[in-house]
């Protein structure tokens, strides 16, 4: 039986048009895409009719990134295929797979994804990268931005780019040389403006998932690398992330956690530098109010 891919009835659009946030818009139509051709078809139809399109992966966003009153493109779980290198250090995942499922694929290799958002059981690769998710454990070190190796992207005009393929890069340069030149001009403009350069460098020393990754103009000299890293955190506004190849991180077999009490918040903050030297992957500060909220809970 052929699976229905288009919904326009009020009940289904209401159900599928929600995410984990507090905001509400009802899409006019929901398109379920399971391959690149589906994506290109929907983008072409929206271009022809002048309708906007919003991408939805797991729908775990809290800020309304996946709601729309126009066309909603929902990624099917069977979109694309998984490919893992011999030692598991590189892994290509399609946009429709959840972070938890990706880690299940990597577990036999003793590896895992760098980004580990709290919603990893439901959040899918496309959304994790498009929102530059990292979770509490890895901050700015092993987030999506710093662990991607390659990406397959579909743009609004239907153009396809596989950054791992020299042939795809050549084809894209022939059709989109203007875009690549603009990226390099933006980079030159930043380099010629010391104040702008310093501001970008200081901004991205801290954990920052908001807005476009302007640091890509300073971190990379190749326009394809700049473009790929601009996709991270772009929330679907620059193109459709079809698949991502990650540089995976070790999944340590031995793990431990500790609850440490300090006489004051000041003393707790003084422990940050020593904890960094111990390579602690995550630390959470809880004040008396936080402890009071759970002190009567069993366990």
Predicted regions and their residues:
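Short, ordered loop/turn segments at secondary-structure junctions
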Residues: 57-60, 118, 166, 288
């Amino acid at each position: 039986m052929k699976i229905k891919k288009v919904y326009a009835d009020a009940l289904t659009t209401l159900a599928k048009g929600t995410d984990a946030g507090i905001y509400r818009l009802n899409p006019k139509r929901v398109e379920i895409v399971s391959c690149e051709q589906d994506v290109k078809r929907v983008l072409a139809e929206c271009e022809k009719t002048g309708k906007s399109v919003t991408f939805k992966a797991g729908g775990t966003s809290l800020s309304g990134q996946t709601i729309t009153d126009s066309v909603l493109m929902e990624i099917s779980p069977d979109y694309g295929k998984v490919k893992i290198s011999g030692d598991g250090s590189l892994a290509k995942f399609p946009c429709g797979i959840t972070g938890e499922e990706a880690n299940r694929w990597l577990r036999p290799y003793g590896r895992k994804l760098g980004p580990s958002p709290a919603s990893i059981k439901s959040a899918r690769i496309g959304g994790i990268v498009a929102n530059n998710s990292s979770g509490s454990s890895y901050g700015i070190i092993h987030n999506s931005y710093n662990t991607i190796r390659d990406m397959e992207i579909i743009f609004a005009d239907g153009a396809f780019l596989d950054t791992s393929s020299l042939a795809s890069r050549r084809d894209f340069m022939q059709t989109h040389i203007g875009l690549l030149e603009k990226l390099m001009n933006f980079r030159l403009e930043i380099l010629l403006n010391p104040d702008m350069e310093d501001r970008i460098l200081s901004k991205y020393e801290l954990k920052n998932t908001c807005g476009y990754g302007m640091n890509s103009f300073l971190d990379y000299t190749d326009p394809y690398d700049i473009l790929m890293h601009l996709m991270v955190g772009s929330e679907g506004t620059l193109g459709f992330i079809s698949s991502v190849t990650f540089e995976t991180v070790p999944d340590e077999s031995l793990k431990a956690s500790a609850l440490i009490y300090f006489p004051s918040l000041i003393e707790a903050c003084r422990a940050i530098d020593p904890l960094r030297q111990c390579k602690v992957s995550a630390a959470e500060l809880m004040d008396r109010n936080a402890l009071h909220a759970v002190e009567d809970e069993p366990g």
